[in-house]
Amino acid sequence: MPFSNSHNTQKLRFPAEDEFPDLSSHNNHMAKVLTPELYAELRAKCTPSGFTLDDAIQTGVDNPGHPYIMTVGAVAGDEESYDVFKDLFDPIIEDRHGGYQPSDEHKTDLNPDNLQGGDDLDPNYVLSSRVRTGRSIRGFCLPPHCSRGERRAIEKLAVEALSSLDGDLSGRYYALKSMTEAEQQQLIDDHFLFDKPVSPLLLASGMARDWPDARGIWHNDNKTFLVWINEEDHLRVISMQKGGNMKEVFTRFCTGLTQIETLFKSKNYEFMWNPHLGYILTCPSNLGTGLRAGVHIKLPHLGKHEKFSEVLKRLRLQKRGTGGVDTAAVGGVFDVSNADRLGFSEVELVQMVVDGVKLLIEMEQRLEQGQPIDDLMPAQK
């Protein structure tokens, strides 16, 4: 398990080749990048909080691959991980984020007025719309590496900040450990709450230690603005509602997020961010905006079409099953969202989803009438 530094010194008694993990059957980004030479070069290093290379890669060693998506296979334990282990993380980031270079700069745009349209996605097809991101609080270790005290301090800070929100963002906090089993399951089934920590990716990285201590969910009174505390990231901020008004969802998201950041700053805390990687999060796949704008969309015909995957790829979108990353589609309903996180601004990513979903609906309508969709095939974005 992560968080043990004396153990790292112990390991160094063995030569690097004796400690190098067997990655022969692995299909993840870490396994593509990590060579015995790189392992030998980085294994003795650690961040100021004691996070090591072996801590970073453990989840990818224990989880060779995923049937639906290519996993990353490495996590950060603190803000410095991306710097201390940059020789591992930079190629992973480049591979994962479409050639993003170590010299590239990330751009942020949380002004919902810059989004064109998006308030009229057809509710006959779009069942719900959702935008989420993560935020990490500077000065604390990230979930794979944080201590109980750090986790509890993050919970306390977050709850204090969130309780200052007012208007339609005002709400309350529900600590996981004080929820009944039934309450918890209801929130999970309604897609409001993260699952119990059964995901091997969470378990192997050390993120599920001490569960459910200092974990919880804050949401406003009508459950359209939610904040998860201490799951994979310090904070996961989510705006969601039924139907196809992505503009409204994104506007609430930007307003709430900006207010939360201001509240943290008033307590002398800021979010981890730098000009190259944007917002720093636990998993390299979420760097940059950390943003996933998604819709649950009914595509019974297009979902079975041989060109469906190609269409999504060209639109820079990805599909997941109805229940999230580890699930299959039920009743022709897919969770469709932006594939990118880094190198595009928040507005650009939501725009891609809005424009792409409109085209998917047009294609579905064509197929309903038994007509071809070849002339609607998009160019690569």
Swiss-Prot record:
Modified residues (Phosphotyrosine): Y125
GO cellular component term of the entry, any: extracellular space
Enzyme class: transferase
Post-translational modification Phosphothreonine, affected residues: T35, T322
Listed Basic and acidic residues bias regions: 96-110
Domain Phosphagen kinase N-terminal: residue ranges: 11-98
Modification Phosphoserine, positions: S4, S199, S309
Post-translational modification: Ubiquitinated by the ECS(ASB9) complex, leading to its degradation by the proteasome.
Expressing tissues: In the kidney localized primarily in the outer medulla in the thick ascending limb and distal convoluted tubule.
EC number: 2.7.3.2
Modified residues (3'-nitrotyrosine): Y269
PROSITE patterns per UniProt: PHOSPHAGEN_KINASE, PHOSPHAGEN_KINASE_C, PHOSPHAGEN_KINASE_N
Primary location class: cytoplasm
Region feature Disordered, mapped onto this chain: 96-122
Record has Kinase as a keyword: yes
Keyword terms, alphabetized: ATP-binding, Cell membrane, Cytoplasm, Isopeptide bond, Kinase, Membrane, Mitochondrion, Nitration, Nucleotide-binding, Phosphoprotein, Transferase, Ubl conjugation
Protein residues bound to creatine: V72, E232, S285
Positions that bind ATP: 128-132, 191, 236, 292, 320-325, 335
TM spans (from-to): none
Function: Reversibly catalyzes the transfer of phosphate between ATP and various phosphogens (e.g. creatine phosphate). Creatine kinase isoenzymes play a central role in energy transduction in tissues with large, fluctuating energy demands, such as skeletal muscle, heart, brain and spermatozoa. Acts as a key regulator of adaptive thermogenesis as part of the futile creatine cycle: localizes to the mitochondria of thermogenic fat cells and acts by mediating phosphorylation of creatine to initiate a futile cycle of creatine phosphorylation and dephosphorylation.
Family statement: Belongs to the ATP:guanido phosphotransferase family.
Assembly and interaction partners: Dimer of identical or non-identical chains, which can be either B (brain type) or M (muscle type). With MM being the major form in skeletal muscle and myocardium, MB existing in myocardium, and BB existing in many tissues, especially brain. Interacts with SLC12A6 (via C-terminus); the interaction may be required for SLC12A6 potassium-chloride cotransport activity.
Domain notes: The internal MTS-like signal (iMTS-L) mediates targeting to mitochondria thermogenic fat cells.
The protein, known as: Creatine kinase B-type
Source species of the chain: Rattus norvegicus (Rat)
Gene name as annotated: Ckb
